[in-house]
From Swiss-Prot:
A double ring-shaped homohexamer of HslV is capped on each side by a ring-shaped HslU homohexamer. The assembly of the HslU/HslV complex is dependent on binding of ATP. This is ATP-dependent protease ATPase subunit HslU. It comes from Stutzerimonas stutzeri (strain A1501) (Pseudomonas stutzeri). PANTHER family: ATP-DEPENDENT CLP PROTEASE ATP-BINDING SUBUNIT CLPX-LIKE, MITOCHONDRIAL-RELATED (PTHR48102), ATP-DEPENDENT PROTEASE ATPASE SUBUNIT HSLU (PTHR48102:SF3). It holds the Pfam family AAA. Belongs to the ClpX chaperone family. HslU subfamily. The gene is hslU. The keyword Chaperone applies.
Length: 447
C-alpha cells in the first residue's frame, strides 16, 4: 500500500459521503502497515497495529468503508459478522475460523495475481495446443527418424492469424483437457469446517492429473486450456509461503455487528454466549497462533477493525479487555438532508445514475432535476426521523417506490417518448411519495 492517507481518503470520497473521521482513521491505519514494513526487522516485530472501533447508526457508511478498503488495500482482507460466531462449547462456528478464512482469501488473491502475471505465457501455450489440434503432426513415412513438423509452417501461420482474429471461434475441435474433480458434498456439524475442507481436498486430489477428450468450440477450448496452463505455471508451494507471510504481516479483518455480542445491562441468560464470543476474540486480537491450511498463522500483526451501531448497547458494555484492544474509537454521524442530496449525486455510480442507465437500456430517458433530488433527500430524512433510522438505505426504498410505474412500463413509455426525457422534479416526487411520507402509519410499513 504505497498510497498516502490523503490519497486513500480521496479515493474513499469517490464512494462515501461525509464520515471524514472514520476515513482518516482507516487511511492512517492502512498507511501504517506500509510504514511498518520499511522498519528494520527487529523493530518491525515490536510495532503492532492499533485496532479500530467504528461506532455509528446503521446505514451511514461503516460497512461501505470496509468494502472500499478491501479493494484499495491489495492485502488479505476479510469481512465477518460477529453474530455468526459462538463461544467454544456451543453449536456454531468458533472465532478461529476467521483466521482460516483470511488464509483462504490470501491464497485466492495471490493465486489470481499470479495467474494474471502468467496470462501471456498461458495464452501462447493454449494457442499452440489449439493449432496442434487443428493441424495434427504428420506421421513419419517408412523408417525415417527425422522429426516431422506440426503442419506446414505457412499453413500454421495462416491458422494462427485466423485464430487471433477470431475467425475460428465457432469451429469445433477435439481437445484433451484436465478432468474436473468430482464435487463431493460433505455435510458436517458447525465447527467442523476444517475437517470438511481436508476431506474435500483429499477427494479432489484423487482425480488430479486425469485427462479426458472433449469436443468444444475453439473460443471455449481456448479459455479452458489457458486457465489450465496458467495453473500449471503457478508454483503452489511458493504461493502458500507468500500467502502465509501476507496474512501475518498485512492481513485485515473487519468485524461487523460487534455491538450484537455486547452484554446488555438489563438482560441475562443467553448473554453468557455473547460474552464468551468476546472472550474468544481477545487472544485473536491480542496475538495468538492459529492452525490453517497454510500452516501456523500468528495474529500479532493482523489489523482488526470492529464496527457496530450500538443503539441497544454501549461500547462500555463490551468486556473491558476487548475495549482495551480496540484503542482507536471513531464515531460516525447520522446523515442530514444535505448528506442525502450528495449521496444521490456525488459518488461514483450514484443511485440516480444507476437508475438512469438501467432505464436507458430500454430506450427510456429520465432526468433527475435539482429540486426533485432535494425533495427525495428531504423525504428520506423525514421518514428516518419519524420511523426507524436506517440511514442511506432508505434511499433505495424511496427510489424503487418513486420509479415503480416507470420501471414497469419502461418499454411502452420508450415507444411513446418523442425525444423528451421524463423529468423527476419536486412535483413528480410529491405526487408519488408525498402522501406516503406524510402518513406515519403508511410510511412505517411501505417506506
Amino acid at each position: 500500500m504505497s498510497m498516502t492517507p490523503r490519497e486513500i481518503v480521496h479515493e474513499l470520497n469517490r464512494h462515501i459521503i461525509g464520515q471524514d473521521d472514520a476515513k482518516r482513521a482507516v487511511a492512517i491505519a492502512l498507511r501504517n502497515r506500509w510504514r511498518r514494513m520499511q522498519l528494520p526487522a527487529e523493530l518491525r516485530q515490536e510495532v503492532t497495529p492499533k485496532n479500530i472501533l467504528m461506532i455509528g447508526p446503521t446505514g451511514v457508511g461503516k460497512t461501505e468503508i470496509a468494502r472500499r478498503l478491501a479493494k484499495l488495500a491489495n492485502a488479505p482482507f476479510l469481512k465477518v459478522e460477529a453474530t455468526k460466531f459462538t463461544e467454544v462449547g456451543y453449536v456454531g462456528r468458533d472465532v478461529e475460523s476467521i483466521i482460516r478464512d483470511l488464509a483462504d482469501a490470501a491464497l485466492k488473491m495471490l493465486r489470481e495475481q499470479e495467474v494474471h502475471k502468467m496470462r501471456h505465457r498461458a495464452e501462447d501455450a493454449a494457442e499452440e495446443r489449439i493449432l496442434d489440434a487443428l493441424l495434427p503432426p504428420a506421421r513419419p513415412v517408412g523408417f525415417s527418424e527425422e522429426p516431422v513438423q506440426s503442419g506446414d509452417s505457412n499453413t500454421r501461420q495462416l491458422f494462427r492469424k485466423r485464430l487471433r482474429e477470431g475467425q475460428l471461434d465457432d469451429k469445433e475441435i477435439d481437445i484433451e483437457v484436465a478432468e474436473s474433480p468430482a464435487g463431493v458434498e460433505i455435510m458436517a456439524p458447525p465447527g467442523m469446517e476444517e475437517m470438511t475442507n481436508q476431506l474435500q481436498n483429499l477427494f479432489a486430489n484423487m482425480g488430479k492429473g486425469k485427462k479426458k477428450s472433449r469436443k468444444l468450440k475453439i473460443k471455449e477450448a481456448f479459455k479452458l486450456i489457458r486457465d489450465e496452463e496458467a495453473a500449471r505455471l503457478v508454483n503452489e508451494e511458493d504461493l502458500k509461503a507468500r500467502a502465509l507471510e501476507a496474512v501475518e504481516q498485512n492481513g485485515i479483518v473487519f468485524i461487523d455487528e460487534i455491538d450484537k455480542v455486547a452484554k446488555r445491562g438489563n438482560t441475562s441468560g443467553a448473554d453468557v454466549s455473547r460474552e464468551g464470543v468476546q472472550r474468544d476474540l481477545l487472544p485473536l486480537i491480542e496475538g495468538s497462533t492459529v492452525n490453517t491450511k497454510l500452516g501456523m498463522v500468528k495474529t500479532d500483526h493482523i489489523l482488526f477493525i470492529a464496527s457496530g451501531a450500538f443503539h441497544l448497547s454501549k461500547p462500555s458494555d463490551l468486556v473491558p479487555e476487548l475495549q482495551g484492544r480496540l484503542p482507536i474509537r471513531v464515531e460516525l454521524k447520522a446523515l442530514s438532508p444535505q448528506d442525502f442530496e450528495r449521496i444521490l449525486t456525488e459518488p461514483h455510480a450514484a443511485l440516480t445514475e444507476q437508475y438512469r442507465e438501467l432505464l436507458k437500456t430500454e430506450g427510456l430517458h429520465i432526468e433527475f432535476l435539482e429540486d426533485g433530488i432535494k425533495r427525495i433527500a428531504e423525504i428520506a430524512w423525514q421518514v428516518n426521523e419519524k420511523t426507524e433510522n436506517i440511514g442511506a438505505r432508505r434511499l433505495h426504498t424511496l427510489l424503487e417506490r418513486l420509479l415503480e410505474e416507470v420501471s414497469f412500463s419502461a418499454a411502452d413509455l420508450a415507444g411513446k417518448q418523442q425525444g423528451e426525457p421524463i423529468r423527476i422534479d419536486a412535483a413528480y416526487v410529491n405526487e408519488h411519495l408525498g402522501e406516503l411520507a406524510q402518513d406515519e402509519d403508511l410510511s412505517r410499513y411501505i417506506l
